[in-house]
Amino acid sequence: SCAGGLSGISHIPVTRLEAKGEKLTVKISGLMGGHSGAEIDKNRANANSLLGKFLHGLDAKAGYELISVQGGQKDNAITRESIAELLTVKENVEAVKEYAASMQAAWREEYAGTDEGITVTVTEEGEQDVKVLHPTSKEKVVFFLVNVPYGVQKMSGTIKGLVETSTNIGILKTSENEVLGSSSIRSSVETARDALSDKIEYLTEFLGGEYE
């Protein structure tokens, strides 16, 4: 049966703390993007997925607090640009910039021939008093971004070259008390589509969130 697609929306609740430090905006941009149905098999990067990898890897390089993550307008478009607002101490600013440069180089190599314009920029916003995510909330958000599936999950066993099942984390938004992620889940097989939706639901609920 032809099942088509569905949107799975994850709501991850967050709590905040007052903090003071150097505010940085990290922007991942320059991606090819495309339609999550037509272009999902072309090995293009999704900026929201890259942002998750960036934030997780950064923890080992420089301590930081997370303020917000955002990226994408439509869940059926491969996200071309994603932004994280961070707070760190002055001594760590250079380390964040160095890490951004190294990730940009690594991703351009990883996506050679398919997404070579990936750019990672760090903008200094100066010293600010802001409400950052509680460390537990930050970890949940980063864990969600690293683990929410993206891309081709299965090729068709009967039609050569046809994508059977895929998913795209196309929208990321942060408000005062939640981070929202919206995925476009597609499959020509209804049970496979539902299983993939269930997987994202399980991830969301495990992190204390709600899924619709």
Predicted regions and their residues:
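Redox- and metal-dependent alpha/beta enzyme cores, enriched for Fe-S-associated oxidoreductases
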Residues: T191-E210
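Midchain, well-structured core segments that form catalytic/ion-binding scaffolds
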Residues: S1-R186
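Short secondary-structure junctions
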Residues: Y64-L66, G208-E212
